[in-house]
């Protein structure tokens, strides 16, 4: 969807009507897929032989917040989403105003996404050798290296694509490992507190993704507004250009450092 959106908008006229048409097309496709899922999946309800022990909410919350590894996973998920949102959002500005070709966003994002998807498939083979935490850290170090590569030639499309591929490879272990790490935190929580709460741990950890996505989107908007960004202008001020480059180059590094620190705490 992300890769196809801008080319579709351009194809339909690159105006408000084009955005509406693109959104409607995606909505219709989503509706069709949901209907296929609804009419072709049969729910099988398994009645358990014995009713599970009901845990009071207070006791469950106390056990949750005493689980330090759940808190680390909450942070990992949140900052992972923040890094992804910042990289994806600011890249549209970068392609439009720095590379002077908004359509390049689809190429750069596709390069990162394809690399990420390929590596995610082989991560399970690497986990037994390196471990989830170490593999995640190694990948994030590669993300930092990818940003440094991009800094060597900020206006080169080739370098931007190479950097995107490296960044996709680097971030893949985090996306693949964070959910098993949350499951591990549930096992640790049961060992520590004798309270089994898989559902609450995963649900509460997902809050990190919601907060991360919201804060990062709002943060980019505030930063761009603070330097006088105006989307109606064909040419932006020098301050706006500096802000775009600053966020695009250093934003992922900032979040990568935080993620590495969290991984070091996950022992």
Which residues does each predicted region cover?
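Helix-to-loop junctions at the C-terminal end of transmembrane segments
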Residues: 9, 118-132
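Juxtamembrane helix-start elements in MFS-like secondary transporters
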Residues: 19, 101-109, 241
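Structural signature of the two symmetry-related core transmembrane helices
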Residues: 134-149
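Residue-level signature of mid-helix packing/kink "hotspots" within the transmembrane helices
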Residues: 113-121, 214
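Intracellular loop-helix junctions on the cytosolic face of multi-pass helical membrane proteins
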Residues: 1-92, 96-101, 247, 252-267
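A late C-terminal transmembrane helix in Major Facilitator Superfamily
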Residues: 195-227
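Helix-loop junctions at membrane interfaces in 12-TM secondary transporters
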Residues: 151-164
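Transmembrane alpha-helix termini and helix-breaking/packing motifs in multi-pass membrane transporters
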Residues: 2-17, 214-241
């Amino acid at each position: 969807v992300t890769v196809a959106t801008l080319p579709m908008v351009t194809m339909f006229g690159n105006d408000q009507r084009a955005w509406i048409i693109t959104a409607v097309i995606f909505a219709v496709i989503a509706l069709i897929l949901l209907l296929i899922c609804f009419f072709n999946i049969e729910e099988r309800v398994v009645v358990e032989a014995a009713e599970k022990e009901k845990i009071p909410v207070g006791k469950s919350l106390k056990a949750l917040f005493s689980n330090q590894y759940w808190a680390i996973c909450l942070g990992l998920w949140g900052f992972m989403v923040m890094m992804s949102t910042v990289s994806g959002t600011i890249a549209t500005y970068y392609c439009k105003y720095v590379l002077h070709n908004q359509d390049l966003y689809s190429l750069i994002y596709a390069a990162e996404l394809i690399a990420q998807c390929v590596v995610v498939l082989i991560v399970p083979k690497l986990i037994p050798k390196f471990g989830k935490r170490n593999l995640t850290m190694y990948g994030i170090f590669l993300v930092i290296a990818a940003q440094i590569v991009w800094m060597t030639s900020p206006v080169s499309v080739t370098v931007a694509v190479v950097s995107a591929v490296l960044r996709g490879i680097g971030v893949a272990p985090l996306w693949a490992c964070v959910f098993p790490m949350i499951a591990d935190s549930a096992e640790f929580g049961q060992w520590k507190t004798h309270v089994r709460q898989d559902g609450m741990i995963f649900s509460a950890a997902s809050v990190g993704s919601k907060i991360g996505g919201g804060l990062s989107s709002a943060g980019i908007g505030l930063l761009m507004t603070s330097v006088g960004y105006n989307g109606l202008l064909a040419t932006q001020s020098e301050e706006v250009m500096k802000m775009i480059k600053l966020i695009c180059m250093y934003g992922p590094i900032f979040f990568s450092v935080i993620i590495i620190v969290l991984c070091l705490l996950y022992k």
